[in-house]
Amino acid sequence: MKGVNMEKQQPSKAALLSIIPGLGQIYNKQKAKGFIFLGVTIVFVLYFLALATPELSNLITLGDKPGRDNSLFMLIRGAFHLIFVIVYVLFYFSNIKDAHTIAKRINNGIPVPRTLKDMIKGIYENGFPYLLIIPSYVAMTFAIIFPVIVTLMIAFTNYDFQHLPPNKLLDWVGLTNFTNIWSLSTFRSAFGSVLSWTIIWALAASTLQIVIGIFTAIIANQPFIKGKRIFGVIFLLPWAVPAFITILTFSNMFNDSVGAINTQVLPILAKFLPFLDGALIPWKTDPTWTKIALIMMQGWLGFPYIYVLTLGILQSIPNDLYEAAYIDGANAWQKFRNITFPMILAVAAPTLISQYTFNFNNFSIMYLFNGGGPGSVGGGAGSTDILISWIYRLTTGTSPQYSMAAAVTLIISIIVISISMIAFKKLHAFDMEDV
């Protein structure tokens, strides 16, 4: 890398010249970088005029002739080209910042790459890790960000069973879908019912599986327990069997009339609990009992993962801490509260939080166990539907409401992201320095 002469550069002038990308770099005597930036801009301008402009125009209008114009395809293609425009805008402002920063570095006597060879060498030495993650960012852009943008756009259209392209055109309707959730009594009632059950479900089911997982791990880690490997295998069985098989099996077991729970388990329990004698619990025909069954099932399905995670953490806690606590006269509860649980929380907090976010969107158990039933709460939602399964109903019913489903999807995303970020911040989930 070549040194830099002491000629002073003007950072503001370099930034101003970079209004045309590349000129600021050329001013800083980085001609190779400048011509590359200028070339990227020329290619983008040609692409924008030839390809992006027509598609972005179609994105705004969503077509004007039914049958010929497919509004949905126009929206998707427009979103695709919009990503490239956004990427270039980020590049454009980065180019201005780069010119300003390099000019300041030159004035401070810091060497900067001038030739193409120096640039390649600098990238290899300092930027090689970033080159390796570029494919991941590209994949993430089109596998995650692109669908999110399309969903966001659909939420602001009237895409439903009455407006199905290409026979009908879509129109931009602004916030109508979001306001309809609150203004239309059917959707307002359904949304309130589904949201409240979703929150109860996520909190109850996740907490249950975490408590069972931590409890079984602590018991299995006790020195007086014999046959730990056998217990380990038994505790892992719910994890080893595919979840959909377990859910379908439980669905049969909880059948009101012929299920094993009512016909075999309850008669055995009735010997110890007389009030259960002759009882037939309506597991799949009463919404309350269905919800209880769902929570118990998720506790069974989810605890093995927490068990394995917690057991690994417990085995890594130094015995010196427990010995010191014993000398200080601490009992078992004090050891757990002041040593065990803080260590588990410090290491596993991100994973524990993810259990709540996962169950908030746990579609499979709702769909496979009882199809969101029994009964309905209006708006196309079943009595045990959570938000994600309600979205499924909105998009696959006889009168699909795609735009409304997209609006609910965005609401889910906002709720989950907000709660997760608050939880991560409050628990200092990624602050591992003190562990």
UniProtKB/Swiss-Prot annotation:
Membrane topology value: Multi-pass membrane protein
Cell location: Cell membrane
GO CC annotations, alphabetized: maltose transport complex
Coiled coil stretches, renumbered: none
GO molecular function, one term: ABC-type maltose transporter activity
UniProt cross-references to InterPro entries, sorted A to Z: MetI-like, MetI-like_sf
Similarity comment: Belongs to the binding-protein-dependent transport system permease family. MalFG subfamily.
Function: Part of the binding-protein-dependent transport system for maltodextrin; probably responsible for the translocation of the substrate across the membrane.
PANTHER family on file: MALTOSE/MALTODEXTRIN TRANSPORT SYSTEM PERMEASE PROTEIN MALF, MALTOSE_MALTODEXTRIN TRANSPORT SYSTEM PERMEASE PROTEIN MALF
Name of the featured protein: Maltodextrin transport system permease protein MalC
UniProt lineage: Bacteria, Bacillati, Bacillota, Bacilli, Lactobacillales
Gene that this polypeptide is encoded by: malC
